[in-house]
Amino acid sequence: MAIITLSRGTYGGVKQVAECLSERLGYGLLTREELLAACAQEYGATPTQLESALMQRPGLLEGRGLRRLRYIACVQAALARRVQGDNMVYLGQAGHLLLKGVPHLLRVRVVANVEHRIAAVMEKTEFTRDRAIQYLREMDEERDNWVRWVYGVDFNDPTNFDLAVNLARVSVARACTIVIETVTQDFQTTPESQQILDDLAIGSEVRARMGLDQGIGDERITVEAKDGVVTIMADTRHLAEAEKVKELARQIPGVRDVQATTAAR
């Protein structure tokens, strides 16, 4: 039992790998589009707003981009809840970062055939070959900039992944076999790793609910979850807001206790 995230470039053609893994392992398959639709229903945002938050940095008029960060928190919470039961393949933007720190998460980077990507863009958009190449470069650059803005890391840094497969060199079937061999040997769920995922789901849910509450200045309050205990940290000026967060946290499934501490200014 494990979780697999597949990351790829725009028009990467990775869906076949995801479907192969889902069928051979008996895992559920969750796409970004399905996740965003469910997230929009749960948190009251539109899929377009959520997708924009997952693809683009804030514009010049958005300041620090707090609204986008709140939407990202909502997506993280929705994803964490959906993979809590394990046996899931997620195909979408930044899944390996949204679930970072979960030991039974296998983070796979799928490198697509460049010509396949170009052909896919040309077929869908009717771009010329040169325009399709330019478009892919722009999309990849935007994604890289987004990852650096949100997480402070390079999307292409190999240390952010556990495994890479190159579809220009191996078939979909072989890529699927490589991933299956890796996940079954090295990424099985333990009680300890499950608790880490449960805490991630709780913490991200609290942060998502905070961000949607206009009466809470969420950038001034820190939330941590460990072993089902939520700890809320705020300075003395924001204790009233911290009390609101405590009430939110108590309503979230899996929370055993809620504590509040005063953070140093």
Region spans (language model):
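Extreme N-terminal starter segment of soluble prokaryotic enzymes
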Residues: 1-3
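Glycine-rich phosphate-binding P-loop
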Residues: 5-19
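Post-Walker A helix-loop "phosphate-sensing" segment adjacent to the P-loop in P-loop NTPases
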Residues: 24-30
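ATP-dependent small-molecule kinase phosphotransfer cores
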Residues: 35-87, 127
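ATP-dependent NMP and nucleoside kinases share a basic, alpha-helical "lid"
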Residues: 88-124
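N-terminal targeting leaders
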Residues: 101, 112, 119, 123, ...
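A glycine- and Lys/Arg-enriched "phosphate-lid" helix/loop adjacent to the NTP-binding pocket
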Residues: 111-151
